[in-house]
Amino acid sequence: MEEPEEATQATQEAPLHVSQNIAKQVVNNENVFMKLVMTRMLDGKTEVIPLTTDVHNGFWRFGRHKSCEVVLNGPRVSNFHFEIYQGHRNDSDESENVVFLHDHSSNGTFLNFERLAKNSRTILSNGDEIRIGLGVPKDEISFLCQVPVKHSRDSQKNMIKSENSHYEIIRTLGSGTFAVVKLAVEVNSGKWYAIKIINKRKILLTSSEKRATEMFQREIDILKSLHHPGVVQCHEIFENDDELFIVMEYVEGGDLMDFLIANGSIDEQDCKPLLKQLLETLLHLHKQGVTHRDIKPENILITNDFHLKISDFGLAKVIHGTGTFLETFCGTMGYLAPEVLKSKNVNLDGGYDDKVDIWSLGCVLYVMLTASIPFASSSQAKCIELISKGAYPIEPLLENEISEEGIDLINRMLEINPEKRISESEALQHPWFYTVSTHEHRTPPSSSEHEATEQLNSSS
């Protein structure tokens, strides 16, 4: 398909425009063959685009040209970038219907992080991610594909049902020792959720049934009681004989660790509102009597408009049986406070308070500013020694030109004596928040930042 002659520079128009005539046709249309959830837009807003066979014979064109069914504006968008349509898998009219993605772009269309060959087509499936401008975060536009249940093969196999809702599983988001997290869509509302599925039998093998039940109930009560914009919200909780399901809001931007690995350190001035958000969330949690105990970049999720939400309140992680605390928490040891490591009898009522979260958040701040881990060693014993002494390297902070106020705040958050460690409310009043960084944002990352990103990759 030839692209019309038109200027290729970026425009100042809205990033997304769907023809009003088309928009009216697709509302409540039973002929929708796919929904695209725009999980990353230039304006930070999430849009849902239902694709129907009633529009343009079922061929949906995406691009910058005004004749496209979906008009996208951005420096990486071609006039006709790609099209999506429904068709037969092969030339036979009796073959099954599938959904095709056909690339026509100059700058590239990416499917699940792989660039498609120009003018090639591929079959789309539930949970596929289409991207434009991959590798340039400020220009990136992305879509998440949802095939309606009636078009999905083995749909019943991929369904989870509670008393009031049906969820279609799209793909796996992550997994741990006792739990797996799935991306799912609630069939009736079309809303996206992250469902944590906890294997109760695995937990019961490592702990008494009474202890496990008490821990479950305690954590469930915490999840139900937390209502704050800085906390991932719980939608519903239900269970069967083998599994417990926690349905949480889906935060589309991924976690902070993935962001840092992809983009390197965050400019000091840009870190200030992010840390402020996290401190305010911790202040709320601690006032509610909740200590998170596992603050780390992987448990901090990012919305499209870069609001941070704390997740994972340890339902799968706090359960441990005969294994030692360090064996259970070895993956997150680099963020643990000294008093936690020194505690000989670690349990939910251990001898430490909510200052442990301040220490962990100090580590997170260090990681954001430097893209490196403050307490890292190939030896577990050496890592414990470094944490116990509060001995983190100052060089990455100096190389990133972090201000004296920024270094002072980190020092006060990483104070090994919890009684002397700064509190959330004190940290929010620290001079760092009220000084302006004198150096500009550094782009592209330097070679030292590249090495730091490699360290993050190896530690995550």
UniProtKB/Swiss-Prot annotation:
Self-association state and partner proteins as the record states: Interacts with rad26.
Domain spans labelled FHA: 60-116
PANTHER family: OVARIAN-SPECIFIC SERINE/THREONINE-PROTEIN KINASE LOK-RELATED, SERINE_THREONINE-PROTEIN KINASE CHK2
Sequence ranges assigned to domain Protein kinase in this UniProt record: 167-433
Name of the protein this chain belongs to: Serine/threonine-protein kinase cds1
This protein's GO CC annotations: cell division site; cytoplasm; cytosol; nucleus
Residues bound to ATP: L173, G174, S175, G176, T177, F178, A179, V180, V181, K196
Taxonomic placement: Eukaryota, Fungi, Dikarya, Ascomycota, Taphrinomycotina
